[in-house]
Amino acid sequence: MKTSRLPIAIQQAVMRRLREKLAQANLKLGCNYPEPKLSYTQRGTSAGTAWLESYEIRLNPVLLLENSEAFIEEVVPHELAHLLVWKHFGRVAPHGKEWKWMMESVLGVPARRTHQFELQSVRRNTFPYRCKCQEHQLTVRRHNRVVRGEAVYRCVHCGEQLVAK
């Protein structure tokens, strides 16, 4: 999806949130970190990614359109926090104590590692697998690893190895 397909109001709301949280961080940290590059090129089930070396945030336009309010409130600060942590502390654990501190103490946003958005529209082909207690859907990548004998996956609930249906 090209940026031009995203309504301008949503793009403006994203920029407003990014600038608001960046200004808040700069004030609290006593720094003058620059505005990162922003693109809408993230694909798949990831809501966004922070590219440290290029100081860029890539957002998933499909998930943004489907979950605008929650996405703007949570994902934009989440990715910004990664860039700010990298600038402030250098290379550290992606969701470590520095990131949690940046999210909660500096940006004032709950530190959640994953989103809870519905993924049906962005999920690629999946393969059904079973265990004792339920059916699972494995991604193409995980399925291929099983087929090649490179990986074994287990159910987090019952611990049984997953087998193809």
Curated annotation (Swiss-Prot):
Protein keywords: Cytoplasm, Metal-binding, Zinc
Location in the cell: Cytoplasm
Enumerate the active-site residues: 79
The UniProt note on the cofactor reads as follows: Binds 1 zinc ion.
Q: Which SMART domains match?
A: SprT
Source organism's superkingdom? Bacteria
Q: Which residues bind Zn(2+)?
A: 78, 82
Give residue ranges for domain SprT-like. Answer: 22-163
> What's a GO cellular component annotated to this UniProt protein?
cytoplasm
Q: One MF term from GO for this chain? A: zinc ion binding
Which InterPro entries does the entry link to? SprT-like_domain (IPR006640), SprT_Zn_ribbon (IPR035240), Uncharacterised_SprT (IPR023483)
Q: What is its main location?
A: cytoplasm
GO BP field? response to stress
Report the cofactors. Zn(2+)
NCBIfam families from the UniProt entry: PRK04860.1
Please report which protein family the annotation says this sequence is part of.
Belongs to the SprT family.
> Can you name this protein?
Protein SprT
Write down the species. Shigella dysenteriae serotype 1 (strain Sd197)
